[in-house]
Amino acid sequence: MKKKSFSIVIAGGGSTFTPGIVLMLLDHLEEFPIRKLKLYDNDKERQDRIAGACDVFIREKAPDIEFAATTDPEEAFTDVDFVMAHIRVGKYAMRALDEQIPLKYGVVGQETCGPGGIAYGMRSIGGVLEILDYMEKYSPDAWMLNYSNPAAIVAEATRRLRPNSKILNICDMPVGIEDRMAQILGLSSRKEMKVRYYGLNHFGWWTSIQDQEGNDLMPKLKEHVSQYGYIPKTEAEAVEASWNDTFAKARDVQAADPDTLPNTYLQYYLFPDDMVKKSNPNHTRANEVMEGREAFIFSQCDMITREQSSENSEIKIDDHASYIVDLARAIAYNTGERMLLIVENNGAIANFDPTAMVEVPCIVGSNGPEPITVGTIPQFQKGLMEQQVSVEKLTVEAWAEKSFQKLWQALILSKTVPNARVARLILEDLVEANKDFWPELDQSPTRIS
């Protein structure tokens, strides 16, 4: 019997990640057939440059797929089975400010962590809710697979503000680290490992890694990470210097709890001074991306569109993003795939807030995810997570209530911020920088000396 084929819209069609994801989808058509693929963005000029290349890819590799790029929500979201969302409200220019403003005060400037992550979250909530509402209006049976950052804040916003929506929040960072673990172990794929992991998004720990026969792989991995971080003896592909530093720093992060293996983002919370020291406030990661990947992808897309051929293209398939197909297949075909998702705790972690959005392994089928019970977690992780989940909840409350006070409290609670005064100074700058993107906050009347 012929498999059903699906209609997909990629929300954030103008993203520089879109071409690699489209190539990945075209590479997995046997497992996940597609009849229609649409790109949606509110920036027509940007999306058109990406879409020109994607149109060529599809005509060359799968001409039967109906392709469209649109800025019209009704056209984009009508007759779709899956919405794949990777939006960036404010683009990289705003990310640069998210990073630069905290650094001005000697505080971590990072895309998803600390004040920068809070600022990005405040911009992202409205955009993700808007896409979710379009999907429910025009294709009420569809599922939204959201990998827009900052995933923790976005997931809390959808839990609180759209509690009955068919949205799955997923992150690629654990996937990327597990790819590196597989390389370290000499395995051909991360899928040869069975993992146990818990935490919040960008804030978690692996507690068990086994092979398919049940052999414990943790001792070998822990020994390697304690010496080299997540850097394999031989790299499978070239890694940017800033990412190389991150993977090496896992050595120090792991030392805080040698019984587990950490998510690399914990470096920003456990070693914030080190992160600030190696940052350039005038040239942050956002600048690197704009000058590097963004310039490269757009020049490649322009060339492909001009030549109407991908023969000379250097854009690579984003194999790393194949987890998106795994997730879509799990929903479509009830595969029972085991995946890390960001879901409401609801007892999965016994001694933690039941309403917190936690990142844990789930079994995914046609009705969505079923979290695998983690049990009781240690005081060290519990304490860190309680502080961080409070930051996320207060940020969403601040957005919903337009509350300056609650947003200030979120920054005060962030482990990256040293005190309330610095939190206030950063927030006042962020409010000014984000006036075109955030809700207008009720300016707190309370002044500090």
UniProtKB/Swiss-Prot annotation:
It catalyses: alpha-maltose 6'-phosphate + H2O = D-glucose 6-phosphate + D-glucose. Its cofactor is Mn(2+); Fe(2+); Co(2+); Ni(2+). The record marks E111 as: Increases basicity of active site Tyr. Optimum pH is about 7.6-8.4. Stable from pH 4.0 to 10.0. Its EC number is 3.2.1.122. Induction: By maltose; repressed by glucose. Mn(2+) binds at C171, H202. NAD(+) binds at residues 6-72. Keywords: Carbohydrate metabolism, Cobalt, Glycosidase, Hydrolase, Iron, Manganese, Metal-binding, NAD, Nickel. PROSITE patterns: GLYCOSYL_HYDROL_F4. GO terms for molecular function: hydrolase activity, hydrolyzing O-glycosyl compounds; maltose-6'-phosphate glucosidase activity; metal ion binding; oxidoreductase activity, acting on the CH-OH group of donors, NAD or NADP as acceptor. Cellobiose-6'-phosphate and 6-phospho-beta-D-glucopyranoside are not substrates but competitive inhibitors of GlvA. One of its GO terms (cellular component) is cytosol. Belongs to the glycosyl hydrolase 4 family. Homotetramer. This is Maltose-6'-phosphate glucosidase.
